[in-house]
């Protein structure tokens, strides 16, 4: 359970939010119950698989980082063989779920698997693993559009890009928690790359994501209520900037967790934009 992070649902929620945005936006309302269930289960399964492969990739370095030192693979409570078996079982479950989708979405699902597999290893080669994470967490967006309308319109890609910017911002907040440990062991991240400009760049990424959310709503011809809810939701970014101002580990992690509310706020904005209430 701990290996799959079922005890820490924040990652699942941050993956679920953009999935729901896309499903409801593509359907112009409530999507079919079958597609909704498949995608929700897919989020849970792929999030679990992502955690397993991430811990497998980091098994030799997690023990050197305060926050991750008690993870199952780092402590030896789970063997590498057990982790690999669990990962492939989860992939099989995800594959069976994908078989229930149309061919358009099914083919897109292979990209999702590729992103989930390569992401954990990116921190060894680039300071931008958060960008790959943004693509991985956002790939459910084109998959949702493909499953609902078998097309990938401009609004789909605006939502996808907005999600990448948002993800890089919040995962940089997350990486700020581990920055000292990462510098010591040689792991790369945007928190290290941005250095003393971290808070300013996070604010810029958040601002740019809001611009894309505005364009998305405008092209979707949403009710003005969408923009009102978006404006209210954006105040969470101001709160997060205040939290991370002093770069205190606990406050940076608190800012990261706060993004769950932002994701939910965007979902509410889309509902209001569609239904006009």
From Swiss-Prot:
The chain crosses the membrane at residues 24-44, 81-101, 102-122, 129-149, 152-172, 201-221, 224-244, 255-275. Pfam families: UbiA. GO terms for molecular function: 4-hydroxybenzoate polyprenyltransferase activity. GO terms for biological process: ubiquinone biosynthetic process. The gene is ubiA. Pathway: Cofactor biosynthesis; ubiquinone biosynthesis. It catalyses: all-trans-octaprenyl diphosphate + 4-hydroxybenzoate = 4-hydroxy-3-(all-trans-octaprenyl)benzoate + diphosphate. It is an enzyme of class 2 (transferase). Keywords: Cell inner membrane, Cell membrane, Magnesium, Membrane, Transferase, Transmembrane, Transmembrane helix, Ubiquinone biosynthesis. Catalyzes the prenylation of para-hydroxybenzoate (PHB) with an all-trans polyprenyl group. Mediates the second step in the final reaction sequence of ubiquinone-8 (UQ-8) biosynthesis, which is the condensation of the polyisoprenoid side chain with PHB, generating the first membrane-bound Q intermediate 3-octaprenyl-4-hydroxybenzoate. This is 4-hydroxybenzoate octaprenyltransferase. Belongs to the UbiA prenyltransferase family. GO terms for cellular component: plasma membrane. Its EC number is 2.5.1.39. It is found in: Cell inner membrane. InterPro entries: HB_polyprenyltransferase-like (IPR006370), Prenyltransferase (IPR039653), UbiA_prenyltransferase (IPR000537), UbiA_prenylTrfase_CS (IPR030470), UbiA_sf (IPR044878). Its main location: membrane. Its cofactor is Mg(2+). PANTHER family: 4-HYDROXYBENZOATE POLYPRENYLTRANSFERASE, MITOCHONDRIAL (PTHR11048:SF28), PRENYLTRANSFERASES (PTHR11048). CDD domains: PT_UbiA_COQ2. It is a multi-pass membrane protein.
């Amino acid at each position: 359970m701990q290996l799959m992070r079922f005890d820490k649902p924040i990652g699942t929620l941050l993956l679920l939010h953009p999935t729901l945005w896309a499903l409801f936006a593509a359907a112009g309302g409530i999507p079919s119950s079958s597609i909704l269930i498949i995608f929700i289960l897919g989020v849970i399964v792929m999030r679990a698989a992502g955690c397993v492969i991430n811990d497998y990739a980091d098994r030799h370095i997690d023990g050197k980082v305060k926050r991750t030192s008690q993870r199952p693979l780092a402590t030896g409570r789970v063997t590498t063989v057990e982790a690999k078996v669990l990962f492939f079982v989860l992939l099989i479950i995800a594959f069976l779920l994908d078989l229930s989708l149309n061919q358009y979405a099914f083919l897109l699902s292979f990209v999702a698997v590729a992103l989930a597999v390569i992401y954990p290893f990116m921190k060894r080669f680039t300071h931008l693993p958060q960008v790959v994470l943004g693509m991985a967490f956002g790939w459910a967006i084109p998959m949702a559009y493909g499953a609902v309308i078998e097309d990938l319109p401009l609004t789909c890609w605006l939502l996808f890009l907005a999600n990448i910017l948002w993800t890089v911002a919040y995962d940089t907040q997350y990486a700020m928690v581990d920055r000292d440990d990462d510098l010591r062991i040689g792991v790369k991240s945007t928190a290290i790359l941005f250095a003393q400009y971290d808070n300013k760049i996070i604010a810029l990424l958040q601002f740019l994501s809001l611009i894309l959310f505005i364009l998305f709503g405008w092209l979707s011809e949403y009710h003005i209520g969408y923009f009102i809810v978006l404006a209210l939701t954006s105040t969470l970014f101001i709160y997060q900037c205040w939290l991370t101002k002093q770069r205190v580990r606990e406050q940076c992690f608190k800012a990261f967790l706060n993004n769950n509310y932002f994701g939910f706020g965007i979902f509410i904005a889309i509902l209001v934009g569609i239904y006009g209430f």
